[in-house]
Structures are given as C-alpha cells and as structure tokens.
C-alpha cells in the first residue's frame, strides 16, 4: 500500500513537471535535446503579474501573499516600480510584489481584498516585464526542459560530501555530461559528479564510477549526526540513505553493551556506537575500508578494536573468544551486508564447540552449566527481499543458513525500498546459546529467548 502510494506520488510529480512546461516560467522550448550546455539559450523575457504595495505595508503584505509570490530563483521578488508602468507619482513610497503567472484580483478572496485595501494596496494587477536566464532556474527545471524523458529528470541523485552520485540508464548516457554540468552549477556544495558504471557485485561492495563533471577527486568528508567520516568514495561503500538506520541502532544499544560489527565499512555504525561508550569490535575485509575505519576512529576521538579479516573468521575468532570469557554484558552482532550476510549465519551453529560438543539432551553436563553464563547474543541481520512475499522469503533463507527456524518473536524491520520490487530489512533475533554449542540440527533446542528485551 505504502509503495503504491509513493509510486503514484512520483507519477504526479512527473506530470506536474510536464504541465509546468506550458507555464510562462518554463525555460525556452529551444533547449530541448541540448547535449552541450549553452547557458545563453535559456534567456527569455516574460511578463509577471504584480501588485503595488505601500512601503509601510511591506511586512504585512509579504506574510499575507507568501503563497502567491513567484516561485522562481530571482534576485528580488519585491522590486522598485518603473515610472512607465505605475506613473511617476507612485514610484516613490511603493514596491511591486511579483506574483505567480496567472494571478488576478479574482484569485484573492473577498476577505483578502478587504485586507489589502486596508493596507493601501491598489485593486489592480500590473504587468511587469522581466528577463530570465539560466541562473533563475532550479536544476530540475533545467533538466526537465533539456531531457526528452521527464522521468529522467525526476530520478534525483545522492550526495556524499562534495560528490554527487547519479545512476543513469543506457538511454540517458548521451546526456550524461550536460546532466553533470547542470548539477554542478546548481548544487553549491558539489565539486564532483559521478555516474555509477555497474551494480555492486564485487567482494568489497564498491563500484566503478565515471566522473561526468567537476574534479576527479573521490576523497570526501561528511558529517552524519555529528560524527565525522572521511574516505575515498571510489574504493569503499557508503550509503547516505542509511543515516536514519545508523542512528536507530545507535539509539537502541545500551552503553554497557558490547558490539561486534562484522561488515563495518568505514564505521557508520561502529563509530557512533563507540562514541556512546560501548565496547566495539569492528571488522571489514576491504583493506581500504579498514584503513579509513582506523582513520575515522581517530578523527572522532573514540576507541574501537578494528580488524581486517573475513567476516566468518572474525566471528569464529573474536566473537567466540569474547563469549568464552563469560562476560555479563549483552552482545550485539551487526551484519550489514544485505546481499550475502545471510550466508554467514551457519557460522553460529557450533560456534562455541572446541572439539567436543554437547551430546543431545545432556543437560546435566558441567560444561553446559557454564555456558548458561554466556552473555545474550542479539544478531541484527540486514537482508534484501522481494516486495511480494518478502517476509516468507527471508525467513526461508535464514532457516536454510542458520539451520533452524527464525524465532517467532524476532523483529523484522523494513529499512528502505532499494529498487522497484526490492526491499531491505533488518532482522533482529537472539541466538540460542545451546545452538551455538551443538552442531547437529536434531539436538535439544530450548525455546528462544524473548526478543523484546533486545529490540523495541
């Protein structure tokens, strides 16, 4: 239902963009299909409706007419009235309010007209001529005017520091340089515009990209919820759209908890959690991510134990060793690699075994009693699933990898829509300690712990 609503909303936005083409403020039709940016081609003279307002009434009139002022990037929406338009006697002590095209006195209600009269506003609309140019249009107006596909202009972009990142389809590539230049011109904080060449399909989660405008500089800096991050965007993975999710998990964990971030990247989870006071073990296989992880830990003046190893090895060594210390602190295991993280779940089965595993139903075993003091382990698994029957799909894959069904009281949180018919979820559940000490799937397995203590 929500996805359908969003798609319908996008269609309406696109349609409004197409309808906007017929408005007086739309860029000239001659720019359609332009592939090399010619800023001078956007110049045109248009007529705007205007109201003559006494200077002493400017503040009150501005509040009253805010919704009717022209919606355009022009230096002034309140201008000096030219003598040839209003007469010499009215140039002093008055200003012209520039209004949206199509505004007439009939646009105003009787109450508004009465209020305007009390403020000394003449009951008359003036035609004000103004020259518009490239600098007066927003980036989406320029792109909608240039590109033959209105949807192309509405797709948007992601910004990572000074880098703007677009995903262009094959039929959009002939326009890539003009798209990049327009974005560079209009987004003041941008210095580099890149287009992704391919999907993320390598083991380090970064992708090939092409600079389509601006500097060939991929080392960037961002601030997310007050924490600073620096990294080479071409060599590591970063997704600004996960900012809310980073903060959600950070808010959830307690200061006394211990966190193992299996696929830590440059630290978007690990660093804010460490800043909170938690003990953090952060790992990433990508040497570049590991390098920037260390850098960002120092940059944020916090502490985290960082590792550059395979996720499976990290769990089998660092997590296992910590659990065997019988620490009383609750443990969280973050697995943010949604494409393949589910394939790592089998590593938890028999994780605590060291040669000799418990026999089935041997609940009196002395070593088993010791295991009862092992801290609670809450896994937060990120996973992609189809929009249709996605919950059933992810439950099936988790069961296949973990070797047992997902606890009924696990929390399945919809993080975001990543593509048409594709969702990203975070599945949070408490691992059975008995399961981590036994390799056989038919051994005794106690009822799962209630997840509500683990996540709200």
From Swiss-Prot:
One GO MF term: tRNA (guanine(37)-N1)-methyltransferase activity
Enzyme superclass (EC): transferase
Organism, scientific name: Ciona intestinalis
Binding site for S-adenosyl-L-methionine: 246, 284-285, 310-311, 336
Single GO biological process annotation from the record: tRNA N1-guanine methylation
Keywords: Cytoplasm, Methyltransferase, Mitochondrion, Nucleus, S-adenosyl-L-methionine, Transferase, tRNA processing
E.C. designation(s): 2.1.1.228
Protein name: tRNA (guanine(37)-N(1))-methyltransferase
Main location as per UniProt: mitochondrion
GO CC terms of this entry: cytoplasm; mitochondrial matrix; nucleus
Domain of life: Eukaryota
PROSITE patterns: SAM_MT_TRM5_TYW2
Source lineage: Eukaryota, Metazoa, Chordata, Tunicata, Ascidiacea
Function: Specifically methylates the N1 position of guanosine-37 in various cytoplasmic and mitochondrial tRNAs. Methylation is not dependent on the nature of the nucleoside 5' of the target nucleoside. This is the first step in the biosynthesis of wybutosine (yW), a modified base adjacent to the anticodon of tRNAs and required for accurate decoding.
